[in-house]
Amino acid sequence: MSQKLMFLFTLACLSSLPSPFISAQIPAIGNATSPSNICRFAPDPSYCRSVLPNQPGDIYSYGRLSLRRSLSRARRFISMIDAELDRKGKVAAKSTVGALEDCKFLASLTMDYLLSSSQTADSTKTLSLSRAEDVHTFLSAAITNEQTCLEGLKSTASENGLSGDLFNDTKLYGVSLALFSKGWVPRRQRSRPIWQPQARFKKFFGFRNGKLPLKMTERARAVYNTVTRRKLLQSDADAVQVSDIVTVIQNGTGNFTTINAAIAAAPNKTDGSNGYFLIYVTAGLYEEYVEVPKNKRYVMMIGDGINQTVITGNRSVVDGWTTFNSATFILSGPNFIGVNITIRNTAGPTKGQAVALRSGGDLSVFYSCSFEAYQDTLYTHSLRQFYRECDVYGTVDFIFGNAAVVLQNCNLYPRQPRKGQSNEVTAQGRTDPNQNTGTAIHGCTIRPADDLATSNYTVKTYLGRPWKEYSRTVVMQTYIDGFLEPSGWNAWSGDFALSTLYYAEYNNTGPGSDTTNRVTWPGYHVINATDASNFTVTNFLVGEGWIGQTGVPFVGGLIA
């Protein structure tokens, strides 16, 4: 094995655990040391040395400097994108302008993440686990944003010198992430048992009834009871506070007739101390492209049920949209809860990438929802996400992105693709070994959709393929039907990422779960309970607090 390959494999092994477990400390971390010593664990040590001053310092001073330089580069890149849009905005193709607009949007998010991270790092050397996880998540997302921008520009042949800046900016953000993860992220002391069979709020739930324990004013309660035609149960201390409620009813008898109008009415930049802004969307087919922008925080959206409240669109790459902007529903606002809603992209199997939901909303939760499309159905783009008792239908790479995401007790339905295509349930997009990202499929069911089950031609179906170099996906305690290829996983192209990815299975059931004939890649593993517990809600998402406050049921550890 070459020295470079050995180094990459070592990085992959070190990064096979979620962020709190990869904080192997640099010797004498609080003492002055050389850039060469500090940069040993950066993805690109030579680049790291080139951006740090050639004088002794500790990891905190180097980390703060790197974050300040990252912030400066992000500001510069926004100016470059603005100039490019001014130059091309009226003459370039729709897809080119779309890619540039995506980059501008992503760059603004990156500015937010870097500013918050820099302010936190400047204020202290010691962070709580949850605060360290916040910053680790923001820096991971900044790198994801750069990668998404670059992909969009490449796909529309509109790089024009921007790709070099993006490449260097991404490397600088990688230095900031590496130094932060080694300096500020504390070692986690796992105090909870591996086995945690009881779900929070279990007494409120039967399977798939989509009810939340809500607490609201008498006026809001009266509105809720009227629109749902059922009486809201009296709440207790565990109930989720609702600050206000508006209704969306297509016949005009509610507050709004469109979902976007209701979202616009939500307060801006709320801290959630007064509860969630509840949008109740009654049954109907809503043909609109819904967006929850980043300033709309603590929004709760409840529908009348799967296949009752349906949001639908048909944008696709073939029709000139970027993958990033093809989504029927776009979520950027943090602390969002979605319940009892179907989101569809009906572009079809011949239109290429066509997203149903794109989520970049931090600490977002979807419960008892359905996402239906073909290629690239569920774009778990970035930050932290949780899906419980949801259905996902798709074909090629139909759960993809680079969030830290757990899908728990969900139904995943590969469907019939265009002839000649294969199905991949996941295509995880981790590009940096220090990112705290990955996809965990926990306690789910994977079986063919009806059209695939009755297909008149053979379709190969896999658990996933590595979209990016450090792709990370774990399938555990999941039922896998017999239609899965025995090899389990598919390559992206040749031997790309086969040594640096982390794919793992643990204690799955069903005729497709036999690992005897699985791939023999260096990055593939059959893991034990201790390793699997690293990818649970409690350990991977640090989720007991933020998911617990939503009222959505979850299992924090492995299922007994």
Curated annotation (Swiss-Prot):
<feature type="site" description="Transition state stabilizer">
    <location>
        <position position="375"/>
    </location>
</feature>
<feature type="region of interest" description="Pectinesterase 20">
    <location>
        <begin position="246"/>
        <end position="544"/>
    </location>
</feature>
<feature type="binding site">
    <location>
        <position position="467"/>
    </location>
    <ligand>
        <name>substrate</name>
    </ligand>
</feature>
<feature type="glycosylation site" description="N-linked (GlcNAc...) asparagine">
    <location>
        <position position="31"/>
    </location>
</feature>
<keyword id="KW-0063">Aspartyl esterase</keyword>
<dbReference type="GO" id="GO:0030599">
    <property type="term" value="F:pectinesterase activity"/>
</dbReference>
<dbReference type="GO" id="GO:0045490">
    <property type="term" value="P:pectin catabolic process"/>
</dbReference>
<feature type="active site" description="Proton donor; for pectinesterase activity">
    <location>
        <position position="376"/>
    </location>
</feature>
<feature type="glycosylation site" description="N-linked (GlcNAc...) asparagine">
    <location>
        <position position="168"/>
    </location>
</feature>
<keyword id="KW-0732">Signal</keyword>
<dbReference type="Pfam" id="PF04043">
    <property type="entry name" value="PMEI"/>
</dbReference>
<keyword id="KW-0964">Secreted</keyword>
<feature type="glycosylation site" description="N-linked (GlcNAc...) asparagine">
    <location>
        <position position="307"/>
    </location>
</feature>
<keyword id="KW-0961">Cell wall biogenesis/degradation</keyword>
<feature type="glycosylation site" description="N-linked (GlcNAc...) asparagine">
    <location>
        <position position="251"/>
    </location>
</feature>
<keyword id="KW-0378">Hydrolase</keyword>
<dbReference type="GO" id="GO:0005576">
    <property type="term" value="C:extracellular region"/>
</dbReference>
<feature type="active site" description="Nucleophile; for pectinesterase activity">
    <location>
        <position position="397"/>
    </location>
</feature>
<feature type="glycosylation site" description="N-linked (GlcNAc...) asparagine">
    <location>
        <position position="255"/>
    </location>
</feature>
<feature type="binding site">
    <location>
        <position position="323"/>
    </location>
    <ligand>
        <name>substrate</name>
    </ligand>
</feature>
<feature type="glycosylation site" description="N-linked (GlcNAc...) asparagine">
    <location>
        <position position="507"/>
    </location>
</feature>
<keyword id="KW-0134">Cell wall</keyword>
<comment type="pathway">
    <text>Glycan metabolism; pectin degradation; 2-dehydro-3-deoxy-D-gluconate from pectin: step 1/5.</text>
</comment>
<protein>
    <recommendedName>
        <fullName>Probable pectinesterase/pectinesterase inhibitor 20</fullName>
        <ecNumber>3.1.1.11</ecNumber>
    </recommendedName>
</protein>
<feature type="glycosylation site" description="N-linked (GlcNAc...) asparagine">
    <location>
        <position position="456"/>
    </location>
</feature>
<feature type="compositionally biased region" description="Polar residues">
    <location>
        <begin position="419"/>
        <end position="439"/>
    </location>
</feature>
<feature type="glycosylation site" description="N-linked (GlcNAc...) asparagine">
    <location>
        <position position="314"/>
    </location>
</feature>
<feature type="region of interest" description="Pectinesterase inhibitor 20">
    <location>
        <begin position="25"/>
        <end position="179"/>
    </location>
</feature>
<feature type="glycosylation site" description="N-linked (GlcNAc...) asparagine">
    <location>
        <position position="340"/>
    </location>
</feature>
<dbReference type="InterPro" id="IPR006501">
    <property type="entry name" value="Pectinesterase_inhib_dom"/>
</dbReference>
<feature type="signal peptide">
    <location>
        <begin position="1"/>
        <end position="24"/>
    </location>
</feature>
<dbReference type="GO" id="GO:0042545">
    <property type="term" value="P:cell wall modification"/>
</dbReference>
<feature type="glycosylation site" description="N-linked (GlcNAc...) asparagine">
    <location>
        <position position="528"/>
    </location>
</feature>
<feature type="binding site">
    <location>
        <position position="353"/>
    </location>
    <ligand>
        <name>substrate</name>
    </ligand>
</feature>
<dbReference type="InterPro" id="IPR011050">
    <property type="entry name" value="Pectin_lyase_fold/virulence"/>
</dbReference>
<keyword id="KW-0325">Glycoprotein</keyword>
<comment type="function">
    <text>Acts in the modification of cell walls via demethylesterification of cell wall pectin.</text>
</comment>
<feature type="region of interest" description="Disordered">
    <location>
        <begin position="417"/>
        <end position="441"/>
    </location>
</feature>
<feature type="binding site">
    <location>
        <position position="465"/>
    </location>
    <ligand>
        <name>substrate</name>
    </ligand>
</feature>
<dbReference type="GO" id="GO:0004857">
    <property type="term" value="F:enzyme inhibitor activity"/>
</dbReference>
<feature type="glycosylation site" description="N-linked (GlcNAc...) asparagine">
    <location>
        <position position="268"/>
    </location>
</feature>
<dbReference type="InterPro" id="IPR035513">
    <property type="entry name" value="Invertase/methylesterase_inhib"/>
</dbReference>
